[in-house]
Regions:
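Histone-fold recognition with a strong bias for associated Lys/Arg-rich disordered tails
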Residues: 1-178
Length: 178
């Protein structure tokens, strides 16, 4: 299996800054939990833990429960097999490679030039993996998530590495006067 660095570097130029950070955090979570492989639940937990990311608000907009997604992802990571006595090398699991490929495909189908966190969440909803079941259990479906992404993007594509960073800025730094 390929080392983490190789798979992530291969796609680095196509990832938004936020998604790159989430992948790094997923790797840190796998290391901290003594997991041999980085799995989709690590990445799901990483995006849910990002206070400045858009995952929680996107899930909420899609009618889901972000706290439940986060709690269930944490529980799933806690249940993963632990390996002790390794050199601290973690590898990308097959499921995560599959999801990253699906994520890239979702982004390309939408005309995005960069792969974003929201495309990862969307790709997950189309799989039979535990991370997908966590989203479904919290009320997130592919159809609802697609509608939420469309509403957040306002028809725009992700055209640069900072594409998802500025989206919630207006909401964050303004007061709703209605």
């Amino acid at each position: 299996r390929p080392k983490v660095r190789n798979v992530f570097e291969m796609r680095q130029d196509k990832l938004t800054t936020k998604f790159q950070q989430a992948l790094g955090e997923a790797q840190s979570l796998a290391l901290a939990h003594d997991n041999q492989y980085i799995e989709p639940v690590h990445l799901l937990l990483a995006v849910m833990n990002d206070q400045e990311g858009s995952a929680s608000s996107l899930i909420e907009r899609a009618g889901g429960n972000p706290k439940r997604v986060r709690d269930e992802a944490q529980a799933a990571v806690d249940r993963l097999p632990k390996v002790t006595g390794t050199s601290g090398d973690v590898q990308v699991g097959r499921d995560l490679i599959r999801v990253l490929n699906l994520t890239e495909k979702e982004a390309m189908q939408r005309g995005d030039q960069f792969i974003s966190t929201e495309m990862f969440l969307l790709a997950l909803t189309g799989t039979d993996m535990e991370a997908s079941r966590i989203l479904a259990g919290a009320g997130v479906t592919k159809k609802l998530l697609e509608a939420a992404i469309q509403a957040v993007r306002g028809g725009e594509n992700v055209t640069d590495a900072e594409g998802e960073s500025g989206r919630d800025a207006i909401k964050k730094y303004t007061v709703d006067l209605t």
